[in-house]
């Protein structure tokens, strides 16, 4: 699970490298899992980025280090915590997604992210 102030990798080509979670949409609890929409603060970005350091954006969690339990009893776990920055219509701001994403995004209607991802686990 991702908590408040957790530093996450950004898995798209918006130019942001690291982002910190500052809130979760629609919930009082301060934790987030795969497929949750969160608000992030950009901690580190490249010089020619479309999003700059210090900006606040919405993002969706695509990978977590904490295991995700599936209906068949199996668990899925990634090596890093990662997010994809999204616009107000829940479409990704970038045009590429780096690394695998969880299949649970399909159930939460993030089809554009699923189609851009190189691998869906």
From Swiss-Prot:
Pfam families cross-referenced by the UniProt entry: Ribosomal_L14 (PF00238)
SMART domains: Ribosomal_L14 (SM01374)
CDD domains in the cross-refs: Ribosomal_uL14
InterPro entries in UniProt: Ribosomal_uL14, Ribosomal_uL14_bac-type, Ribosomal_uL14_CS, Ribosomal_uL14_sf
Alphabetical keyword list: Ribonucleoprotein, Ribosomal protein, RNA-binding, rRNA-binding
GO MF term list: large ribosomal subunit rRNA binding; structural constituent of ribosome
Gene Ontology biological process: translation
Signal peptide: none
Gene Ontology cellular component annotations, sorted alphabetically: cytosolic large ribosomal subunit
Family, as annotated: Belongs to the universal ribosomal protein uL14 family.
Function: Binds to 23S rRNA. Forms part of two intersubunit bridges in the 70S ribosome.
PANTHER family referenced in this protein's UniProt entry, alphabetically: 50S/60S RIBOSOMAL PROTEIN L14/L23, LARGE RIBOSOMAL SUBUNIT PROTEIN UL14M
Assembly and interaction partners: Part of the 50S ribosomal subunit. Forms a cluster with proteins L3 and L19. In the 70S ribosome, L14 and L19 interact and together make contacts with the 16S rRNA in bridges B5 and B8.
Name of the protein: Large ribosomal subunit protein uL14
Organism: Opitutus terrae (strain DSM 11246 / JCM 15787 / PB90-1)
